[in-house]
């Protein structure tokens, strides 16, 4: 039975990822005053299926000088971790109800760095290695702010469990009292998922394609699936943390619809940013975090710690 539950979580995620690629291509097409994919099926709706078939029937080539085992393990690990991060998300019920679900997600997002590093190193290509090192530095750096922002939100939530955020946001979204945190969180998620304008790992002009330059066919598709699964997951987490989908007791079945609509809104915002903004320079990317976001998030965290203590000393107002 548990295996069936796992499949009913994984298959919709993979389908969502497939159609997110179509949505992105359509979105970029219309932003650039063209149609986007519109040949395969009505309005190009079958494009993701043909893409998947094409990629998985291609021969998975690897360089002769590559480290074969790591070369194959890296994309598999990337997708496995991307799918595992969906386990504790309440939609409205998580697959596994954990007490420390936030810590579990932080630990898994840190492990995702290894997949990128191994893929770059095992390819035995200088472009792939430079791309991987950039990705690792960027991901590790932005995880610092993500962790501090999550800590600030959890101080308001009073628990490490994601499910309790639904109760916390019953009357007001946490986005409203903590909008500076939400803005920094959203920008950090862009950097964490290596999306434009922070897609320095894939700098076509200088690094060809980044850490996955030597991958073709199936293994490349696994990296692609992992990246887009992470994007949807990060937006789902943003929705849970800041735009808690209200669990209406009259229409409890509307929770998931509400939740997915907000996640789709954030994901579309990701695509809009990609179509609108140019890429950051690497030093600007690091300065943004270490000189701007880190001091700000630390101040906000201290504020969320001191506020309850200050208010606790006020006598009850009658």
Curated annotation (Swiss-Prot):
GO terms for cellular component: mitochondrial inner membrane. It is found in: Mitochondrion inner membrane. Keywords: Electron transport, Membrane, Mitochondrion, Mitochondrion inner membrane, NAD, Respiratory chain, Translocase, Transmembrane, Transmembrane helix, Transport, Ubiquinone. PROSITE patterns: COMPLEX1_ND1_1 (PS00667), COMPLEX1_ND1_2 (PS00668). The chain crosses the membrane at residues 3-23, 68-88, 102-122, 146-166, 171-191, 222-242, 253-273, 294-314. It is a multi-pass membrane protein. One of its GO terms (molecular function) is NADH dehydrogenase (ubiquinone) activity. Its EC number is 7.1.1.2. GO terms for biological process: aerobic respiration. InterPro entries: NADH_UbQ_OxRdtase_su1/FPO, NADH_UbQ_OxRdtase_su1_CS. It catalyses: a ubiquinone + NADH + 5 H(+)(in) = a ubiquinol + NAD(+) + 4 H(+)(out). It is an enzyme of class 7 (translocase). Its main location: mitochondrion. The keyword Electron transport applies. It comes from the Eukaryota. HAMAP family: NDH1_NuoH. Belongs to the complex I subunit 1 family. Core subunit of the mitochondrial membrane respiratory chain NADH dehydrogenase (Complex I) that is believed to belong to the minimal assembly required for catalysis. Complex I functions in the transfer of electrons from NADH to the respiratory chain. The immediate electron acceptor for the enzyme is believed to be ubiquinone. PANTHER family: NADH DEHYDROGENASE SUBUNIT 1 (PTHR11432), NADH-UBIQUINONE OXIDOREDUCTASE CHAIN 1 (PTHR11432:SF3). This is NADH-ubiquinone oxidoreductase chain 1. It comes from Nyctalus plancyi velutinus (Fine-haired noctule). The gene is MT-ND1.
């Amino acid at each position: 039975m548990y295996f069936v539950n796992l499949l009913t979580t994984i298959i919709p995620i993979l389908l969502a990822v497939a159609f997110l690629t179509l949505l992105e291509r359509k979105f970029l097409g219309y932003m650039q005053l063209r149609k986007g994919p519109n040949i395969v099926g009505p309005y190009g709706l079958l494009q993701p299926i043909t893409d998947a078939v094409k990629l998985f029937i291609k021969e998975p080539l690897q360089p002769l000088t590559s480290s074969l085992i790591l070369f194959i393990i890296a994309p598999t690990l990337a997708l496995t971790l991307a799918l595992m991060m969906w386990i504790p998300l309440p939609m409205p019920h998580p697959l596994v109800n954990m007490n420390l679900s936030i810590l579990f997600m932080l630990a898994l997002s840190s492990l995702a760095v290894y997949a990128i590093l191994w893929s770059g190193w095992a390819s035995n290509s200088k472009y792939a290695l430079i791309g991987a090192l950039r990705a690792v530095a960027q991901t590790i750096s932005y995880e610092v702010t993500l962790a501090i922002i999550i800590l600030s939100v959890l101080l308001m939530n009073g628990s490490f469990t994601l499910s309790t955020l639904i109760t916390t946001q019953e009357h007001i979204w946490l986005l409203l009292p903590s909008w500076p945190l939400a803005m920094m969180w959203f920008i950090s998620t862009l950097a964490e998922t290596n999306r434009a304008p922070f897609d320095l790992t894939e700098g076509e002009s200088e690094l060809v394609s980044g850490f996955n330059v030597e991958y073709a066919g199936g293994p490349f598709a696994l990296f692609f699936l992992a990246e887009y699964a992470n994007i949807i997951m990060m937006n789902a987490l943003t929705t849970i943390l800041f735009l808690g989908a209200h669990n209406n007791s009259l229409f409890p079945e509307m929770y998931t619809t509400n939740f997915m609509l907000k996640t789709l809104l954030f994901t579309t915002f990701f695509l809009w940013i990609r179509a609108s903004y140019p890429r950051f320079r690497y030093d600007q990317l690091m300065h943004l975090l270490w000189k701007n976001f880190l001091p700000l998030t630390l101040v906000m965290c201290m504020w969320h710690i001191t506020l309850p203590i200050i208010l606790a000393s006020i006598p009850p107002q009658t």
